[in-house]
Amino acid sequence: MNYFRYKQFNKDVITVAVGYYLRYALSYRDISEILRGRGVNVHHSTVYRWVQEYAPILYQIWKKKHKKAYYKWRIDETYIKIKGKWSYLYRAIDAEGHTLDIWLRKQRDNHSAYAFIKRLIKQFGKPQKVITDQAPSTKVAMAKVIKAFKLKPDCHCTSKYLNNLIEQDHRHIKVRKTRYQSINTAKNTLKGIECIYALYKKNRRSLQIYGFSPCHEISIMLAS
């Protein structure tokens, strides 16, 4: 599939713009200035539209290829401000620290947590161990999951310290000062950011960190 058909700019320009934004804590204006320094004049609003268009595509391609997970999962959530109101980004990683999935919700309750875990099981199968924080909503959700999917009663472990690994994964989101104006904008952007970060972590754990290029990864994904 040609994802760059009828585009005014060359695909290399688009992949650089999208890759830089999704990988680094840069603004759309920063990306526009970087491209201008390379002799390419692109308005920052155009960069925004590219990110909104390609980030969900990259996320879907990544999810289709990402089907395996280790038996132990860690699940946590963090706060994301959207148009002045708090929303909640649920995140899951496996025993090796690889990202399983993310999900942005307006509410932090047992229904949201249950739906997220159910979604994970549908994609990766049943886990042997799930580590979460001690939030009451998560405990209720896990009790429902254990009953619904007939998991072992002791598969759920709550610990603030055992879950430190996944809390570190929130940092690359927290360092950004992005002001999201709608839930859809936030969803699209975060899907792209998490997709690239997941690929970065995979390269880092396979000792290929010095060869990681978000633009190269995007080119490969969109060429498949």
Curated annotation (Swiss-Prot):
PROSITE patterns referenced in this protein's UniProt entry, alphabetically: INTEGRASE (PS50994)
Cystine pairs: none
UniProt entry keywords in alphabetical sequence: DNA recombination, DNA-binding, Plasmid, Transposable element, Transposition
DNA-binding region: 33-52
Signal peptide: none
InterPro entries referenced in this protein's UniProt entry, alphabetically: DDE_dom, Integrase_cat-core, IS_Transposase, RNaseH-like_sf, RNaseH_sf, Transpos_IS6
Gene3D superfamilies in the cross-refs: Ribonuclease H-like superfamily/Ribonuclease H
Domain Integrase catalytic, chain residue ranges per copy: 73-222
Job of this protein: Involved in the transposition of the insertion sequence.
Protein's name in the database: Transposase for insertion sequence element IS257 in transposon Tn4003
